[in-house]
Structure formats: C-alpha cells, structure tokens
Design a protein with these regions (language model features):
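Alpha-helical transmembrane segments of multi-pass integral membrane proteins
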Residues: 1-212
Length: 212
C-alpha cells in the first residue's frame, strides 16, 4: 500500500505539468480567444502550488488525507485550465478542429462545485486528518452528501452554457427542470451549511488547542 501511494503521488506531478503545458500551448494558439495571460497565470499558479503542497504532504504523511485532498484539488484546477483552453481553441479559435470539445465545455462550465470541495474537506479534517467528533461530524456528512449531489446533478441542466460557449449543445440529457431545481437547491443549502460548519469547526478546534 505504501508503494501504491508513492506511485500515485509521484504520478500526479508529471500529470499536472503535462496539463499546464497543454494549457499554455492551446492558449498560445487561440489568439484573441485565449482566456488571457492573467487568468491563465492565476490558474497555473493555483494549480501548481496546490499540487506541490499536496505532493509534499502526501509523501511525508501519507496516512493524513489532507495531502491527498490538496493533490486532487490541484489536479482538478490543472484540468479546468486545460479543458478551458481546449474549448477556446476547438470551439472559438478553430471550430471543429478538435474532437470532444463539447465535453471540455461540460467540464469547464459544470464542475464548479469541485472548487469548494477540497477546501471544505481540508477544514473538516485539519490538522489530524480525522473527522471531528461530536456535533461537527453529522454536518461534515451533510456537506459530503450535498457536494456529491451537486457534482452529479449540475451537468444535467437545460440551461445553456455560460458565454462564450452558450451556442455549444450539452451532450448530456437534461433532468426535468422542476426536479433539477429541487435537487440543486437542496444541494446548495447543504453545501453552504457544510462550509459554514467547516469554518466553525476549525475555529472550535483552534480555541480548544489554545485554551481560549
């Protein structure tokens, strides 16, 4: 198991670097349809730093999930940058030049709940790597279930993609609008409660640690 974890951790670095390289290449060839230097730099910096910190924690404290959560979060940011660049190039700059651009748009536009999963999960297991006991544990489970629901349901909407990809057809089927709204609202409420609970649980543990 130790070897498997090391292989996974070390594999994440070249994957992240390859993703960043692909992003830069596609954006450099997208002309005026590029996301822009500032946005690309921000995504790459966030993805690289998160992946790097996660990698160091994962190989030094492999049983603590914080490193693995950060590693996964960094790879997600890297993939968002790459899929955005892929869509910019294949949909806007050179239409129909690349396969599967509609799936890249789905990932870029409809996986936004993932942006909040990592930081919420880290908050709940900080610093020991274990979920807090008592009242915080049920709230953590509510957060997990709510985020899972948002991730699963969000892509199946009838709404158009955000600009500049509004004209792209969603390759996935859509849920009934009423059912979709109900599931999204429940998921959002649970996720928001979970994020507030995560912040309060960190505050509670810090107060307990300092005796204040």
């Amino acid at each position: 198991m130790h070897r498997v974890r090391l292989i996974v951790a070390w594999s994440a670095l070249p994957l992240a670097l390859a993703s960043f390289g692909a992003t830069l290449y596609l954006e450099a060839n997208s002309g005026s349809y590029s996301s822009g230097l500032l946005k690309n730099a921000a995504f790459i910096a966030a993805g690289f730093s998160t992946t790097g910190v996660g990698f160091l924690l994962a190989i030094r404290q492999e049983r603590n999930p914080i490193g693995w959560i950060l590693l996964a979060s960094g790879l997600y940011l890297a993939l968002v940058g790459t899929t955005t660049a892929y869509a910019n190039y294949g949909v806007l700059a050179n239409p129909d030049s690349l396969p599967g651009t509609e799936w890249a748009v789905v990932f870029e536009d409809r996986t936004w709940p993932m942006l909040f999963v990592g930081i919420t999960a880290v908050a709940y297991v900080f610093p020991t790597g274990a979920l807090p006991a008592g009242r915080w544990r049920p709230i953590a489970w509510v957060a997990g279930v709510s985020f899972a629901a948002l991730i699963l349901v969000t892509p199946f909407t009838t709404e158009a993609f955000a600009d500049p990809f509004a004209a792209v057809n969603n390759p996935l089927p859509s849920l009934d609008p009423g059912m979709y709204a109900l599931l999204i609202n429940l998921g959002m409420a649970g996720a928001l409660a979970g994020m507030v609970g995560a912040a309060l649980s960190v505050r509670s543990r810090l107060k307990a640690a300092t005796g204040t």
